[in-house]
């Protein structure tokens, strides 16, 4: 008997959307994949030519997956419009499985006039190395057209609610922890796709001038090593960068600091309790008091993880922030100021430098020395 859901539909019920697009990273009993699509010709402000929904079962035959249903429909429709360039957008409850991911990459390679943007509510089998490699192959840009994959944020959920749900003019009501789950998934996807930072973003935010204005974001680059027989083994799959989520960014009312976003994602790494790990963070600002307290709690409760922090600048080194740094150091964290060596390492490791070597800015070493002195005074409780 063939699975149902063969033909596309135009809208879904509110409960169906909320249940299937719920973005908690680990979720069971969601075996139906919902794919909302929009097709339009390339160009600014072009309205969609078609917008409907395909459904399919996760464990059914590949041809019954909604991604394959879409391409079966689109291929027939495309024959009538062979010379036109199209932009396709998917909003999908699960990211495509490994086989669908490879077939999508093949389709796009064979039809360079089609671009695809995929917004996913959740990542399917994100811990599997074969799946990670398939996603990287789909999203790489260097040898031909590929897809762009992003995690659905509040704006995409709101768009789907308005476009594909029988909303009866009711406003979309986000569920609890939607912003937190988005941040977690965004970080995990960045790890998988090995996102890199733009050079201007790095040089602007990590510049270590003693007094800077307008640097309200905190960037945090991280890498993880497993300690074994007095040697360190770098875990390449546990490396990436993130920044704080400012209030109202992506439609979320509340913000979240970069350090807390980082602590949120560590449990999903499933680090072996019987192994010892070293986590190294390179931050544009040292942690604030609250973040330092939370990081201290984390390393106190996770004895198999040691924490090393290199900061480009010291955040508000007066009062409670000084106390927070001392608490963090007392808990066992190593806190240092970034020098030329760390800036170069971050440039080489986390920046899309296109082969250009790191160029230090004027005063880098002098600023590092001055900040190191201030940090030593703080940690020794000597003030300025």
Swiss-Prot record:
Q: Where is this region: Interaction with DNA?
A: 213-215, 313-320
**Segments of this protein annotated with the region Necessary for homooligomerization:** 209-336
One Gene Ontology MF term: RNA binding
Where along this sequence does the record place binding of Zn(2+) 2?
Answer: 257, 288, 291
Per the annotation, which location comes first and is thus the protein's main one?
Answer: cytoplasm
Gene Ontology terms: biological process: cytidine deamination; cytidine to uridine editing; defense response to virus; DNA cytosine deamination; innate immune response; negative regulation of single stranded viral RNA replication via double stranded DNA intermediate; transposable element silencing
The residues annotated as the active site are: 259 (proton donor)
Record site feature (Interaction with DNA), residues: 244
Entry GO terms, CC? cytoplasm; nucleus; P-body; ribonucleoprotein complex
Residue ranges annotated for the CMP/dCMP-type deaminase domain, each copy included? 29-138, 214-328
List the cofactors. Zn(2+)
| Entry-annotated residues carrying Phosphothreonine | 32, 218
Question: Known EC number(s)?
Answer: 3.5.4.38
Q: Do you know which PROSITE patterns this protein is assigned to?
A: CYT_DCMP_DEAMINASES_1 (PS00903), CYT_DCMP_DEAMINASES_2 (PS51747)
Similarity remark = Belongs to the cytidine and deoxycytidylate deaminase family.
Any idea what job this protein has? Answer: DNA deaminase (cytidine deaminase) which acts as an inhibitor of retrovirus replication and retrotransposon mobility via deaminase-dependent and -independent mechanisms. After the penetration of retroviral nucleocapsids into target cells of infection and the initiation of reverse transcription, it can induce the conversion of cytosine to uracil in the minus-sense single-strand viral DNA, leading to G-to-A hypermutations in the subsequent plus-strand viral DNA.
Q: Could you give the domain comment from the record?
A: The CMP/dCMP deaminase domain 1 mediates RNA binding, RNA-dependent oligomerization and virion incorporation whereas the CMP/dCMP deaminase domain 2 confers deoxycytidine deaminase activity and substrate sequence specificity.
Share what the entry says about its subunit structure, partners included: Homodimer. Homooligomer. Can bind RNA to form ribonucleoprotein complexes of high-molecular-mass (HMM) or low-molecular-mass (LMM). HMM is inactive and heterogeneous in protein composition because of binding nonselectively to cellular RNAs, which in turn are associated with variety of cellular proteins. The LMM form which is enzymatically active has few or no RNAs associated. Its ability to form homooligomer is distinct from its ability to assemble into HMM. Interacts with APOBEC3B, APOBEC3F, MOV10, AGO2, EIF4E, EIF4ENIF1, DCP2 and DDX6 in an RNA-dependent manner.
Could you tell me what this protein is called?
DNA dC->dU-editing enzyme APOBEC-3G
Q: Which organism is it from?
A: Pan paniscus
Gene, per the UniProt record: APOBEC3G
